[in-house]
Amino acid sequence: MSDWDETEHPRDTRGRFRDKSGGWVEQVADRLVDPGYVRGQPIDLDPDVIERLARVRARDMAEFVELGSDRVGGDSRLAEIAQMQGWDAPGETGTPQQLQDLLEQGGVRLWRGVTPPVSSVDWTGGLFPGKGSPQWPTEAIAQTVRDHKTGPVRYGYGIYGNGMYTSVNADSASAYAMDGEREAAIRMVLRPGARVAQWEDREEWYDEYERRLGEMGLPEDTRRNLTDYGLAAMLLGYDAIHVPPGWDDGTDWDDAQYVVLNRTAVLFEAEPGDDWED
């Protein structure tokens, strides 16, 4: 993104932005549908965008070689696109009633189980069963949950596209939550009106994206750097990818999944609940 130029965003005498027809304030206001929700828009793959994504990808690969896959902080290409879209803002949290209100308006309840990074493990013994097990400090669990909501955006890797994987099934989330603890799970609601790409319709949106990539005549390594379902969906302005039931989710349930790409498109619970009830 280009540097901020204050002269392009004039303010009134009290420091508030003056609205100009067709200007920056109006453009941003059009994208703020609900408080805290920034609606995405298609991003052109111009040379500057391609160079930015190549740069962060090279950094990810260097970290992978140096630190190993368990220490790499996710796909930085998607974090870069989130910044371009304005999706890198802290997530919004709400009360149980506020989440329920969104559900009644057509939102989708989602769950995500988390485990703190390996670097926070306190090893009390050996690596094998019966010789001790890793112990995650309580604060590490709480910090991981907070980071998902309001920390720097981080996107994991997955077969249906990189992003933040969630499930409509609390049982699926418990399988990924540290020791199945409720404190290591996050309940959230995908806002009504969120723009969702359908996994089973990917021939329509992803194949079209790849076709356009092919027409650009990019070098093979550059083109390969731009091929991921989650990355493509973000560039197209989608908030999430919906994967219907029946596709492998890594648990025994294989329920519907949503790969969340726009953190502002969900409302998180402010504090972990004390149960797994829907």
Please report, for each region that a protein language model flagged, where it lies by residue.
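Short hydrophobic alpha-helical segments that form membrane-spanning helices or hydrophobic packing faces
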Residues: S21-G23, Y176-A177
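IQ-motif-like calmodulin-binding regions
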Residues: S2-R14, R18, V25
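Small disulfide-bonded, cysteine-rich extracellular recognition modules and tandem repeats
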Residues: R18-K20, V114
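Active-site and NAD+-binding cores of ADP-ribose-processing enzymes
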Residues: R31-D171, A177-D278
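Charge-dense, low-complexity polyampholytic segments
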Residues: G23-R31
